[in-house]
């Protein structure tokens, strides 16, 4: 499929999406307000750009991966300046439902197509090709660019009208928080009972009480080291 994928936001999620697609011979152009994020990706073949406008002008499909609504609104304000009708924007950020619907309307008014496509998974899950994507919106646009979504996820699902992707992601997040909290309480309880945290992780991980979150975050808890896969909020905390 001869297409150019534009990625706006090259943090822990967007940067890994770019790297994975590049490894699978996709043509990728990217932009991030933090220029240092672009250099290592440029070294492996990504076209480094100077602005959101430049990426939008180059891309057949845009993927936005941004930390908050303020950043997304700034990007959309530039994207709508590019005169490409029916250009598809796959919005992968985790934001409030009303924010996603607002952006959808702004893009629709400029004859652009937004797919609400939040990702279920951590940066390390993206790297390991175990993340999922919940796509919602224009089904024909989703089908057209399905090879792109399949390029960086293990599973992807079309879940209906715009906003359904975010609804599904919020349900997934609810389960993530439940399992993460339970894993943390289990670790603390085990250590108070005199058990070694590394042993707790090793023994419980493959059993009936294990979970994907225990697999990923239990390892961090056992080592008391949360840097790997910590994501944007951990990077902000470290600063």
Where are the regions that the model predicts?
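NAD(P)+-binding Rossmann beta1-loop-alpha1 motif at the extreme N-terminus of oxidoreductases
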Residues: 1-64, 86-88, 123
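Rossmann-fold dinucleotide-binding core
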Residues: 5, 10, 95-173
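Rossmann-fold NAD(P) dinucleotide-binding segment
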Residues: 52-113
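Interdomain hinge/lid region at the active-site interface
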Residues: 166, 175, 212-239
